[in-house]
């Protein structure tokens, strides 16, 4: 591949898996994130574990800061002078009853998941105008399925998917392809609490996957490598599910996790029996 790539949120989880797969494809990868210690540890692990002609650099970056994102793009493109691949992976989650959700919670999720992705796509596209490139945003099946107790997160990912489609339509003339990947549940740092303490929710996810298993970060990375390469050169504006078939069925039931955090009285004020997928 021998291309330059930027992966936001590349220090852990799906972002780490994406960086590893891009390095395996001989890309010159820069991972970005807010915590330098996390990035340094990730870079050391990648350098030690990935055997290829790829390379790894780090840059501290808060994706909600447009100037910081432009600086990160410049770092990623520095050695070659151009950026070939940008992966807008940085994101946060939030869950809880709609009636108790605050506008601050919604705003904070949108700020990272939508504005942060916008900053990344725009900065990368500005660099790619002369030579083209591939931009991939990491969305979620939540953007397609919605679901109870996920109003902030699901709406942010739905907005991200439409941002991708709109950007793809405008940027195609520059030879820039823009797509998103909608992962299903992936075992990573971000989902560790569910795997360790809420196996019933993971089981519910599996029941709604035709393939019957959860994903690995590297499987999302494989999809990124395909979207970044010549094999997908006629693909743009697409929201691609990498989810074991989950979007063929329904959203997971998060009620047990939410109910565990509330008293019966609190819960009765926020949700009514029979309103869930199994009700």
Which residue stretches match the model-derived regions?
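Conserved glycine-rich cofactor-binding loop
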Residues: 11-13
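Substrate-binding pocket helix/loop in short-chain dehydrogenase/reductase
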Residues: 97-98, 105-107, 205
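Active-site loop-to-helix junction immediately N-terminal to the catalytic Tyr of the SDR YXXXK motif
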Residues: 101, 146-154, 166, 194, ...
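Active-site helix of classical SDR
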Residues: 121, 156, 164
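Alpha-helical segment proximal to the catalytic Tyr-Lys
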Residues: 126, 169-173, 233
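Residue(s) in the substrate-gating loop at a strand-loop-helix junction
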Residues: 140
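C-terminal helical subdomain
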Residues: 180, 200-235, 242-244, 270-279
């Amino acid at each position: 591949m021998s291309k330059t790539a930027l992966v936001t949120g590349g220090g852990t989880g799906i972002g780490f898996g994406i960086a590893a797969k891009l390095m395996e494809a001989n890309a010159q990868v820069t991972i970005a994130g807010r915590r330098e210690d996390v990035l340094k540890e990730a870079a050391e692990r990648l350098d030690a574990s990935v055997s290829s002609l790829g390379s790894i650099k780090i840059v501290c970056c808060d994706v909600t800061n447009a100037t910081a994102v432009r600086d990160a793009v410049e770092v990623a493109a520095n050695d070659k002078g151009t950026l070939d691949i940008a992966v807008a992976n940085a994101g946060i989650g939030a869950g809880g009853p709609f009636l108790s959700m605050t506008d601050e919670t919604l705003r904070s999720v949108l700020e990272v998941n939508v504005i942060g992705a916008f900053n990344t796509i725009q900065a990368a596209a500005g660099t790619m105008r002369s030579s083209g490139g591939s931009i991939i945003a990491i969305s979620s099946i939540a953007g397609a399925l919605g679901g109870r107790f996920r109003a902030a997160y699901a709406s942010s990912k739905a907005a991200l998917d439409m941002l991708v489609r709109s950007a793809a339509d405008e940027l195609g003339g520059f030879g820039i392809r823009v797509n998103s990947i909608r992962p299903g549940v992936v075992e990573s740092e971000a989902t560790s609490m569910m795997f360790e303490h809420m196996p019933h929710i993971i089981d519910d996810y599996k029941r709604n996957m035709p393939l019957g298993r959860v994903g690995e970060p590297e499987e999302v990375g494989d999809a990124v490598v395909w979207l970044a390469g010549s094999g997908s050169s006629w693909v743009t504006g697409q929201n691609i599910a990498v989810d074991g078939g989950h979007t063929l069925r329904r959203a997971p039931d998060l009620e047990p996790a939410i109910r565990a955090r509330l008293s019966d009285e609190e819960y009765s004020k926020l949700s009514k029996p029979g309103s869930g997928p199994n009700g």
